Amino acid sequence: VNAFGYLAALGDLTGSGKGADPELAGAYLRLKGTDKELNSLFRKEGISAGPTPSGFFVYNYGAAGIHRRGDWMVTLKAFNTDVWGSEIYTKDNRYGRYQSYGSAPIIGSGNPVSAAASGFVQEGWDWNRVPGATTIHLPYPELESPLPGTLMERNPERFSGASSLEGRNGILALHFVEKDRKNFTPGATAYKSVFCFDNRMVFLGSGIDNDNQAYPTETTLFQLRMDSPAEQIEVDGELYDAFPLNLSRGGERLALSDTKGNFYVVKNAAAVNITKKEQTSPNDKTRAPQTGNFATAWIDHGRAPKQAGYEYAVYIQPTNKEITRLIKKDGYEVL
């Protein structure tokens, strides 16, 4: 954070006539920088905290898009022939294979907002279930990188990336194919897209196809660490606070909430599994087991799916009025 402040203190780049750059200094103050000298300088220059960024931001050198409104942010991540899907090292991120398989974590809870307050905590995190991603749910010894050192796996398909509409809304599109590597499923493929409009995101998947008969293929809606086992999930209008919880639902239309105020509508799914439970997973550096309580929901495509797909919408922190309307009717149309 302080880097914003140091750059701002070098001088004004905007032509404002101030002794420090107001945009960089405003970003530093918004992010609550802690350098006392910088804070004093910016106050003397009459600079206050800048506005929170809002819009859809494209980062195709990372095959990524960031969708922001208010105090929440969603990072959409893919990979392609030029952008690797994750950075795995000897003692870092050993189970991070799925980070770019169409992931879409929502960061928007806490005061201040943080990843931890938004439910993203490593202790007990199931590395197979990255929100938004379509993955094969593997045992951890098989999910761990097959190489003892660095692995930066690329996607053999070039068509993956993000685009924006007038900087306000946008899309992520991804076609991925798994490489032929130890403990991978060669040729496993999926076509995925995410359309972002204000606080709505529409997730579409098709051509989900692989020959892995041993383990199920899944698309994760959410995985969130719970501060209390009594945190509630709403499923088709019914509240569930029991712990542990294990539900399976399907049908033409399924409406559910997560534990952070976000709302999901899943269309024509054979099976959506919803759990609240204690989970144990290995640390990404040491492999030591760690435990935590998590609420999770995922679409189960079964083993060795052939041309499977999905359609679901996510409404980020909707009002009660919005929820009432969405339960009855979609706010979008798939052409």
Placement of each model-derived feature along the sequence:
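Extended polysaccharide-engagement surfaces of secreted carbohydrate-active enzymes
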Residues: N2-L335
